[in-house]
């Protein structure tokens, strides 16, 4: 007798179909019109370790913090191509098309000489040298902090996108209700935030919130002990559906360890007894196992520079192939190979004998940038399918193009007063419409306005000439050549001689 039994195998149902994300090349048409745009010389001067605040007003800064270990996030503003004055507008239909910019060329210029900047802490929690110790040290005292300086990890970085970059760092997480006491090791949480101009990079001590996770303010140098060091979240930006945050990136990092030390203080988690055999005498009590190194970025050389050279964007890593939505582009730069800290000295009192108290010492760091771009003019045909896709991607784009829902005309009776300035009636003053808020207004960026710095004469600029050369294009002649004049030499007629 045969008996039917249901299958015990797992049945997998197909996923619900969703709309696919397509490349911008499928709905953005490129033209043969190119423009050059470049910034002026961008300079920054400040203190490399901390900002100097006004003694009477803590909210006002006298000297900002400018370090070679900071991110420089440039928010480059572009003109609206739909309001651009073109000599010939026959290449597009403003009723059915909209214009956008595509970034096809970029060069980040860096001034100032190569140099290695150092940092440190006048009271660093460094107990003993664990690299070449010739005898077992004794127990630490009440305060064993020392003045120590070091150089940092070497980093060169360039990120390009039409949205600000995303960074990651480790911060203090939320503990459960039945967790350990508050003075124990806090839980860690990976936090994603937008990288802003002035944020500190990873210096070799990890990307973490040092202000929250290090209560002694002495485990790292003074320029990061009260800050958060961020690292670009490449995994998240490369997996972004629309690819707006990261068109492409250039990265070069190197580091080695110079010295090895350990920390003083009570270990919150002691070394288990089964991992060592107890000693006697000076080794009866083991030393701190909280080891840490001092990083170093090693030699800097002009042969390994990422800057002062052009880069051409043929194909982006994501679905956005260089289209600058919102008429803006974000350029994120890190360059620790030019992190020299200059020492300034002023004389307080003049004396024939040198005395330290007769002089004041100051430290400053300077940075110099120059941004150059080549943009290609593109057009988007506004079909119903394309507009639906763009609205799902970013509805602000259609709003900037002045597309929106028009309310139907009202059929209800409206009230109109005769004496609009009379105090006997309610105020008839119309409330002005609120200006559109900048969604990125709460973040800090280095604003670069290129709205009036576009030029179609690419051959008049260094990056434009490089682009014309590699693209095989020729610049339009500026001077008309003089037409060659033809001179005829008429042969003299022979006189007839009568014989």
UniProtKB/Swiss-Prot annotation:
UniProt keywords, alphabetically: Capsid protein, Disulfide bond, Host nucleus, Host-virus interaction, Late protein, T=7 icosahedral capsid protein, Viral attachment to host cell, Viral penetration into host cytoplasm, Virion, Virus endocytosis by host, Virus entry into host cell
Alphabetical list of SUPFAM superfamilies matching this protein: Group I dsDNA viruses (SSF88648)
Subcellular location: Virion; Host nucleus
One example of a Gene Ontology biological process annotation: virion attachment to host cell
Disordered, as annotated region: 476-499
GO cellular component, one term: T=7 icosahedral viral capsid
Source organism, top-level taxon: Viruses
Pfam families in the cross-refs: Late_protein_L1
GO molecular function: structural molecule activity
Presence of keyword Lipid metabolism: no
Assembly information from the UniProt record: Self-assembles into homopentamers. The capsid has an icosahedral symmetry and consists of 72 capsomers, with each capsomer being a pentamer of L1. Interacts with the minor capsid protein L2; this interaction is necessary for viral genome encapsidation. Interacts with protein E2; this interaction enhances E2-dependent replication and transcription activation.
Family designation: Belongs to the papillomaviridae L1 protein family.
Function according to Swiss-Prot or TrEMBL: Forms an icosahedral capsid with a T=7 symmetry and a 50 nm diameter. The capsid is composed of 72 pentamers linked to each other by disulfide bonds and associated with L2 proteins. Binds to heparan sulfate proteoglycans on cell surface of basal layer keratinocytes to provide initial virion attachment. This binding mediates a conformational change in the virus capsid that facilitates efficient infection. The virion enters the host cell via endocytosis. During virus trafficking, L1 protein dissociates from the viral DNA and the genomic DNA is released to the host nucleus.
Protein name per its UniProtKB record: Major capsid protein L1
